[in-house]
Amino acid sequence: YQKLIDIRTVPCVECAIYRESGIDLEFIDCGDDDEKGSMLSSLSLCASYRTKNNAKESYLVKTKTLNEILVEYNAPNFIDYISIDVEGAETDVLMSVDFGKYTFGYITIEFNNNCYLKSVIDNILTSNGYIFKQVNEFDIDYIHKSVNK
């Protein structure tokens, strides 16, 4: 985390974004595997990685909701762009957003080519005024109807 702070010029928030605040989530350190970094311990991918590679180090991270962070940093009600990549908890984050208070012009969400996850994301966003734009192997993009011209 300190390395991240050292190279950024924007605020860094030391927490995990989740559907509830104040929970301790366990993450495992995947060591030198730059592709995986750290993973939420409840993910099935993480469980298999832990077994296969004998990953031993884990740590707890306190959670905050996205709304809580937006309020804490006095975010405007309209945010041009947000990218959500939270290691399998994307739908948890989306379900906790107050879409009546915050509008995102364009949203990119990681879904790792998971059809079920894509369907849940689509239901949440389309019911809140977002229009599907594009998809690739890992991410799905939406634009808010107020900026789609």
List each model region and its residues.
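Phosphate/nucleotide-binding beta-alpha loop and adjacent structural elements of enzyme active sites
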Residues: 1-149
